[in-house]
UniProtKB/Swiss-Prot annotation:
Component of a pre-mRNA cleavage factor complex. Interacts directly with PCF11. Belongs to the Clp1 family. Clp1 subfamily. GO terms for biological process: mRNA 3'-end processing; tRNA splicing, via endonucleolytic cleavage and ligation. This is mRNA cleavage and polyadenylation factor CLP1. It comes from Debaryomyces hansenii (strain ATCC 36239 / CBS 767 / BCRC 21394 / JCM 1990 / NBRC 0083 / IGC 2968) (Yeast). It is found in: Nucleus. One of its GO terms (molecular function) is RNA binding.
Length: 497
């Protein structure tokens, strides 16, 4: 039984048995205080709440149930006056014992200064909004309204994702199903890094998974209630690598999200929660597009008075017509400034989890060899490289395609595709080795550039090796089965098993 995936056979496989001799520690957290801790990837913290109520980003921890955390920067908040008691001990994580240069020791402290009261007040305001919308829609089926559409913005390391996760968790506790929209391609939210997702949240997050999100149906069965994200492929981990493609994918994701809200009354009443990459007033065009595409009516600014004032000036016409409200909340004192090494390691673990599952819900990834000639493969265009090439043109010149290269009806569409994707005419190890490839929903006999731009993602595959001699590629899939002969899009996200 222990060898069967899903029955806990691999739960402790990455634990160094010698480390189990470590004595457990007890932490007493006072009411409205939080215990902040950082666990390196080389260490596994095993903790449980033995008394009271404790929650991580709004997700309540089960009483007397041990959970395992690694590579996290979390805080356990005690919402009740009685506080809570936590027991924990640490063991070595054999899977990451040599993969990082970080220390094995955790860092932890208790803080009585927390921004959770502000975040809870924001939640109560949103819930009051949802309640009024629900009552209106119940008696007015012909003129229904939509719940709060919340956009969270702020600088880097301001706690945007933590706030969105907290608001989504609190919404679930009130039996709501808000759509969580992730527009930060750096993070893999129910998908791999480089993707933009929209996911209805109707169940608690899986705190033991990478970044505390949980699994989805895109890679297999899950321990928790599976999330079903709508995934748009962007292909880069920075929104600035191809702004045209980023804005286009945001617009199409917005169309799909608005359509979903019109079809599902529970989602319509619950509204949206939108997480974003670090944005400043210089990125106003992006913010303006998001507000328009997702019909945002509330913008939450975290800890940046200047950004709040500048945005109010830019959106004064919407404020005057009561189409948009602004809310400023303080930045949490527990926000950690993560370095690039931690971000990359977190991305690698996210990709690894996508294909291999978690310790509680392991997957059986499927390896196969495919003939590259049987597939049509595109690659996302890095606009920074394109701009570098155009810089060699003489001053005042610009590149335009030859008129003979395309028909009149297709000129505009075909040339517009070059801004976003380029077809790999000769796939090779130099452009496919150790890369993540998006499997689109578009059959490869479809030659429409517009359909390619509008398609969503079925899932992702990992090309571990490309044989230039045989023109074959070794591919890893998250579950057994034949790879559909759909158009593939190679991303800039690399991964080595």
């Amino acid at each position: 039984m222990s060898a069967i995936p899903g029955f806990g056979g691999d739960l402790n496989s990455n634990i160094d048995e010698d480390s189990n001799l470590n004595k457990s520690s007890v932490v007493e957290i006072n009411g409205q205080s939080e215990w902040r801790f950082e666990v390196p990837f080389r260490t596994i913290m095993k903790l449980k709440v033995v008394n009271g109520i404790g929650e991580i980003f709004g997700t309540e921890l089960p009483l007397n149930v041990e959970i395992s955390l690694t590579g996290v920067k979390y805080a356990i908040y005690a919402p009740l006056d009685e506080g809570c008691k936590v027991e924990y001990y640490c063991v070595s994580n054999k899977a990451n014992s040599t993969s990082t240069n970080e220390d094995d020791e955790i860092s932890e402290y208790i803080s009585e200064e927390t921004s959770m009261n502000h975040y809870m007040n924001l939640h109560f305001a949103l819930e009051s909004y949802r309640q009024s919308i629900s009552e209106h829609n119940f008696v007015n089926s012909s003129s229904q309204k939509t719940g709060p559409r919340v956009l969270v913005v702020g600088n880097r390391h301001s706690g945007k994702t933590s706030l969105v996760k907290t608001l989504a968790s609190y919404g679930c506790k009130m039996d709501r199903s808000p759509i969580l929209v992730n527009l930060n391609p750096r993070d893999g939210v129910f998908s791999v890094p480089g993707s933009l997702t929209a996911t209805p949240i109707s169940d608690a997050f899986d705190l033991e998974s990478v970044n505390g999100w949980g699994g989805s149906t895109t890679s297999g069965s899950t321990f928790h209630n599976p999330k079903q994200p709508l995934v748009k492929n962007y292909g880069f981990t920075s929104h600035s690598d191809n702004l045209d493609l980023y804005k286009y994918q945001i617009s199409k994701l917005g169309v799909a999200v608005v359509s979903r809200m019109e079809e599902d009354i529970a989602v319509k009443n619950s509204g949206l929660l939108i997480d974003t990459p670090p944005l400043s007033i210089k990125d106003f065009t992006i913010i303006e597009n998001i507000v328009s595409d997702f019909e945002v009516n509330i913008i939450v600014v975290i800890g940046n008075e200047r950004l709040l004032i500048d945005l109010k000036k830019k959106f004064k016409h919407k404020i005057a017509s009561s189409q948009l409200d602004f809310v400023k909340v303080p930045k949490s004192g527990g926000v950690i400034e993560v370095d690039d090494a931690y971000i990359r390691k977190s991305q690698e673990e996210s990709i690894k989890e996508y294909f291999n599952g978690t310790i509680r819900s392991p997957l059986s990834p499927f390896k196969t060899e495919l003939d590259a000639k049987d597939f049509v493969i595109y690659k996302c265009v890095d606009s920074s490289e394109a701009n570098s090439n155009l810089s060699f043109l003489p001053s005042g010149d610009s590149f335009t395609p030859e008129a003979s290269e395309m028909s009149d009806g297709d000129k505009k569409e075909e040339f517009s595709l070059d801004t976003y994707y380029s077809q790999l005419q000769e796939p090779s190890s130099s452009n496919l080795d150790n890369s993540i490839v998006a499997i689109t929903q578009l059959p490869q006999n479809n030659k429409s550039a517009r359909d390619l731009m509008n398609t969503c993602v079925l899932g992702y595959a990992h090309v571990s090796k490309f044989d230039d001699t045989k023109s074959k590629m070794k591919v890893l899939l998250p579950f057994p089965g034949a790879l559909p002969r759909n158009i593939l899009i190679s991303t800039s996200v690399g991964y080595t098993e």
